[in-house]
Amino acid sequence: MTNISVIAKPYAKAAFEFANEHNLLQQWSKLLQTFSELIKDKSVAAIVSSPTISQIEVVDALKKQLDENFFNFLALIAENKKMLIMPEIADQFESIKKIHNNVRVADVTLAYATDKNILDSLKTSLEKKFGCTIDMHINIDPAIIGGAVVKVGDTVIDSSVSGHLEKLKSILLS
C-alpha cells in the first residue's frame, strides 16, 4: 500500500461508514467521483495547492452547493490539507463498497483479445472459486505469450505460457 493509500484509507472508511449508515452510498459515491475528477484537473489542483488560497477557503466557496454532511467531510479533508488525495479517497471508497457488496475485482491479463464466451466462462469460474461477484478488468499483454494471469486481491493465478516457461526454467536450473 502506498503512502497516499495509507493516508486516504481512514477518510474513505469514515465516508463509507457514514454513507452506508444513512443509505447514501450512491450519492456519496457520485460526489466523491465528481470531486476526484475535479482535483485531477490541473487548474483546480493548482488552486487547491496554492499557498495564497487555503484548501478550507476553496471548500467554503462550495458550501451552498453541497449537502451539509458532505461539506463537513470535505472541510475535514481541507483542514488537514489533503484535498489532493481526493482521487485516492474516492478509489478506496469504491473498493470498500465493492467488498461490502461482495464484489471483488479480477485483473485479467491475456496475450490477446479473446471471445466473450471464454471471458464469461472465466468469470463464472472465478465467481465459484471466490464465492462472490467478480468485476473483471481485462488487460492485453502479448509478453505473456498465451494463457492468462488473474489477480484477485492478493491471489495470483498464473496460467500464462511465459509463467510456465519461467517455472520450467527455474526447475531446470536448480
From Swiss-Prot:
One of its GO terms (cellular component) is plasma membrane. InterPro entries: ATP_synth_OSCP/delta_N_sf, ATPase_OSCP/d_CS, ATPase_OSCP/dsu. It is found in: Cell inner membrane. It is a peripheral membrane protein. Keywords: ATP synthesis, Cell inner membrane, Cell membrane, CF(1), Hydrogen ion transport, Ion transport, Membrane, Transport. The keyword Heme does not apply. Signal peptide: none annotated. One of its GO terms (molecular function) is proton-transporting ATP synthase activity, rotational mechanism. F-type ATPases have 2 components, F(1) - the catalytic core - and F(0) - the membrane proton channel. F(1) has five subunits: alpha(3), beta(3), gamma(1), delta(1), epsilon(1). F(0) has three main subunits: a(1), b(2) and c(10-14). The alpha and beta chains form an alternating ring which encloses part of the gamma chain. F(1) is attached to F(0) by a central stalk formed by the gamma and epsilon chains, while a peripheral stalk is formed by the delta and b chains. Belongs to the ATPase delta chain family. HAMAP family: ATP_synth_delta_bact. F(1)F(0) ATP synthase produces ATP from ADP in the presence of a proton or sodium gradient. F-type ATPases consist of two structural domains, F(1) containing the extramembraneous catalytic core and F(0) containing the membrane proton channel, linked together by a central stalk and a peripheral stalk. During catalysis, ATP synthesis in the catalytic domain of F(1) is coupled via a rotary mechanism of the central stalk subunits to proton translocation. This is ATP synthase subunit delta. It comes from Francisella tularensis subsp. mediasiatica (strain FSC147). The lineage of its organism: Bacteria, Pseudomonadati, Pseudomonadota, Gammaproteobacteria, Thiotrichales. The gene is atpH.
